[in-house]
């Protein structure tokens, strides 16, 4: 069965103009689709247009031209249906310090017009692992719990699409891991996830497909696997018995560096060199190789390659 598009964007353009001579193109004829049930990563450096895109989805920014459909509804013609179809989790943690998670969710559900008989507050608290803290003041929650409470607030009207805008900013590694486990569980229950993050490793691990924006333009849109296959270089690290300087060595397709731990790092182009040949280069320098390890490129390498200009 073919899945429908959760979000469809066609020729989306947003221009912020102070006057005819002073304008900024935040989004330039953007075309993309987010498929139902996927985790979709939206990446880009600061000023790439990510926040503008999310604000257009949420209805807080008016586009200049183009079309945007959310769950089959046009953002201009059906704004109420669009807002009912999407939940936005903002970057900033903004919670009433003296309200409990249960009270905050009940208030949020009321703002969305959800009848009391249709509210699923307890279910949502369990989904984000906050059922034990349901009656605690929100000020007493840890940073990770507050982030999960923001997700819970975005879910009170049971939207099929959840947008996470930098959800792990300022969260430590353990809490970040716990947060992503909750997001994955929501996705398994059928929620379509759109996420922005500056932690590229997270995007690589979490996303089914990734779009990369740069200066308002879409520079890549593909599966995570296909994006990683764009990397043409690989790194090999040698632990040797004494430090040698190879940085002045000029060999086409090889790039040398070293550190004070007697390690030599060589980045090489896969289609030009074999590992055996690189090992022989090190041996010919008269050193003993103690250990060898390799590193494949990651999403950060792709990101830098696509946005460096």
Regions from the language model: what does each represent?
Residues 2-9, 15-29, 79:
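A short, flexible loop at the N-terminus of ABC-type nucleotide-binding domains that lies
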Residues 106, 110-133:
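Conserved ABC ATPase "signature" region
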Residues 137-141:
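Conserved ABC ATPase signature
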Residues 158:
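Conserved catalytic motifs of ABC-family nucleotide-binding domains
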Residues 162-165:
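Catalytic Walker B motif of ABC-type/P-loop ATPase nucleotide-binding domains
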Residues 180-269:
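ABC transporter nucleotide-binding domain
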Residues 235-309:
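Short, charged/small-residue-rich alpha-helical element at the C-terminal edge
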């Amino acid at each position: 069965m073919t899945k429908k598009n959760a979000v469809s964007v066609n020729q989306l353009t947003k221009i912020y103009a102070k006057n005819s001579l002073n304008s900024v193109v935040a989004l330039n004829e953007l075309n993309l689709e987010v498929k139902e049930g996927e985790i979709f990563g939206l990446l880009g450096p600061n000023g790439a247009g990510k926040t503008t895109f999310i604000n257009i989805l949420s209805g807080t920014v008016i586009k200049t031209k183009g079309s945007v459909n959310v769950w089959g509804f046009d953002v201009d013609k059906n704004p109420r249906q669009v807002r009912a179809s999407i939940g936005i989790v903002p970057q900033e943690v903004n919670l009433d310090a003296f309200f409990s998670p249960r009270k905050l969710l009940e208030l949020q559900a009321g703002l969305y017009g959800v009848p009391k008989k249709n509210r699923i507050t307890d279910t949502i608290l369990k989904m984000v692992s906050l059922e034990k803290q349901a009656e605690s003041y929100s000020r007493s929650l840890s940073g990770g719990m507050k982030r999960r409470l923001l997700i819970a607030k975005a879910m009170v009207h049971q939207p099929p699409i959840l947008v996470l805008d930098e959800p792990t900013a300022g969260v430590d590694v353990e809490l970040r891991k716990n947060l992503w486990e909750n997001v994955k569980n929501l996705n398994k229950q059928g929620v379509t996830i759109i996420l922005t993050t500056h932690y590229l490793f997270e995007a690589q691990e979490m996303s089914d497909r990734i779009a990369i924006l740069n200066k308002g333009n879409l520079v890549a849109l593909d599966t995570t696997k296909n994006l990683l296959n764009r990397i043409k270089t690989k790194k090999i690290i040698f632990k040797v018995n004494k430090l040698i300087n190879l940085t002045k060595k000029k060999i086409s397709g090889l790039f040398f560096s070293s550190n004070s731990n007697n390690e030599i790092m060589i980045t090489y182009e896969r289609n030009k060199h074999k590992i055996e040949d690189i090992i022989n280069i090190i041996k010919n320098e008269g050193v003993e190789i103690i250990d060898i390890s390799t590193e494949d490129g990651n999403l950060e390498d792709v990101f830098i390659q696509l946005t460096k200009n």
